[in-house]
């Protein structure tokens, strides 16, 4: 369900693209140094967005540099880190591990079991640093698994559980913005869950795999776009309530345009102009 919260690079200027990539590289650097090379390979742009988002809201000090890495051994890459980079790295590590565990549970693929084994030590360190977050992630994913075992009726329970998972990630600390951050994460999580379900609907039907939209009267996942737009609107409403100035245009690009990239590619629909 990850890989949806990405930028629409074609709509970013060169400076914004450089800024976006530097946060991604900063997160990769934190993953490698904190948890090892295998977790670094499981890096997602979703968690780079988390770093960028929290940094834009709280505006902590930044540090930056340039370095070569496993992905780019020939040329040094610019990176940016803040106080939230380590947190996002830990969440990335936990989510990657739990995702592979769930893949093993669902499909019994040896590759998933092997990946979970390699990610396990890093996830254990991340869980020791953030035990409450680790417990919340595991509980949410267990709720999703249990809800998905009932294929007899349409249910929003899995989407709600994923929404709560994302709410937990964005509520990085208790302060005046926590309720809005939880609302934002909850709405974004539900959007991601249902968007992923819409993109996978045809394939899941062929494979007789669980999909919450399979029991609805629709020919294609593209038919669910109006409902997705409502969820995207909920996330946008929460976002606009936050006093974000730094990197606001970049974040708006991701939320209002980039998040639709995979959906539009899946159904070859024309990208709507953001309002």
Functional labels for PLM-detected ranges:
Residues 1-183, 190, 194-229, 237-247, ...:
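Acidic catalytic motifs of isoprenoid enzymes
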Residues 248-252:
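Short, flexible loop/turn segments with low-complexity composition
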Residues 253-257:
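A glycine-rich phosphate-binding loop feature that marks nucleotide/adenosyl-phosphate handling sites
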């Amino acid at each position: 369900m990850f890989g949806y919260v990405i930028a629409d690079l074609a709509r970013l200027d060169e400076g914004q693209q450089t800024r976006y990539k530097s946060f991604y590289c900063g997160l990769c650097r934190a993953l490698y140094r904190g948890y090892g090379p295998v977790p670094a390979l499981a890096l997602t742009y979703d968690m780079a967005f988390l770093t960028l988002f929290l940094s834009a809201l709280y505006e902590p000090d930044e540090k930056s540099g340039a370095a070569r890495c496993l992905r780019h051994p020939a040329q040094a890459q610019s990176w940016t880190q803040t106080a939230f980079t380590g947190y996002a790295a830990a969440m990335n590590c936990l989510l990657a591990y739990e995702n592979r565990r769930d893949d093993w549970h669902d499909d019994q693929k040896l590759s998933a079991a092997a990946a979970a084994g390699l990610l396990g030590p890093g996830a254990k360190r991340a869980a020791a640093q953030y035990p409450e977050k680790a417990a919340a992630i595991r509980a949410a994913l267990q709720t999703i698994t249990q809800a998905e075992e009932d294929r007899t009726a349409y249910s929003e329970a899995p989407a709600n559980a994923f929404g709560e998972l994302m709410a937990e990630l964005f509520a990085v600390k208790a302060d005046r913005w926590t309720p809005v951050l939880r609302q934002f994460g909850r709405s974004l999580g539900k959007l991601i869950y249902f968007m992923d379900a819409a993109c996978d609907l045809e394939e899941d039907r062929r494979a007789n795999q669980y999909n919450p939209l399979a029991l609805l009267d629709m020919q294609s996942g593209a038919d669910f776009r109006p409902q997705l737009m409502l969820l995207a609107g909920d996330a946008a409403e929460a976002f606009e309530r936050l006093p974000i100035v730094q990197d606001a245009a970049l974040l708006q690009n991701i939320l209002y345009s980039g998040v639709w990239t995979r959906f539009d590619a899946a159904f070859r629909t024309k990208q709507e102009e953001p309002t």
